[in-house]
Amino acid sequence: MGKYSKAVDKNEKYGIMNVGSDDVALEYQRYGRNKNTLVNSTYIESGEYRRKFDNATDNAEVNKALYDNAKKALRHRSGTAFEDMYWIDSNTGKTILAVEDSKEERAIIYNERIMKTIRNESDIITLHTHPSSMPPSASDLNSCFRNGYKKGFVACHNGRVFGYTANEEINERIYNMYVERFTKDGYDEFGAQMRALNKLSQTYDVSVWEVLHNE
């Protein structure tokens, strides 16, 4: 984890945010073009949405924690650009840490409390929200690798759910280069990001998939 400058610097192109004078790290969602952050509460409460989590992992308690936290976070953050995040024990399904008071748009700042908690825990699975309903970002993947997370999940405001793993660090500039290239080829922001992630998975030991419901 690098040190961050005192100046606040949001760089949309590269998905980097430098915040304050403390040593912080963060999950940062690359800004997409979808500005509708309202959550369809009827769908979030539906059986179809619940079934998405039935096989998210091979642990029923973890799946329940993922579902419960996703619903809570989406209800909480509907209509805003703020994110909530949860750290879950992959063995017991216990939520060991929650951040539900982030004041930074589309970001979770890793403060001392978070870093201390994850240093003392292993086999963590994370869940956080993406207000713009984009897939996992390059910084999500790198945070997963750097912090030794077993797996991560993203609950999008439009009801989509994504899972991801990362066993090595990726070059975020290359990711953004791919996104720009696919955008120029005519794909929308979501499609460009998905294709960029697929391209990276051919070179790096990372994986991203959409979590779908069972029929």
Where are these regions (language model features)?
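Extreme N-terminal leader/targeting regions
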Residues: 2-61
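Active-site or metal-binding loop neighborhoods of secreted/extracellular toxin and effector enzymes
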Residues: 5, 9-14, 18, 41-43, ...
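Short HxH-centered metal-ligating active-site micro-motif
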Residues: 12, 22, 100-148, 157
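Charged, amphipathic alpha-helical segments
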Residues: 56-73, 134-139
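A short catalytic or substrate-binding loop motif that flags glycine-/basic-rich loops and adjacent residues
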Residues: 77-81
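Short beta-strand scaffold segments in enzyme catalytic cores
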Residues: 83-91, 153-155
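Short, solvent-exposed coil/turn segments at beta-strand boundaries
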Residues: 92, 147-150
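Short amphipathic beta-strand/extended segments with alternating polar/hydrophobic composition
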Residues: 94-110, 162-168, 176
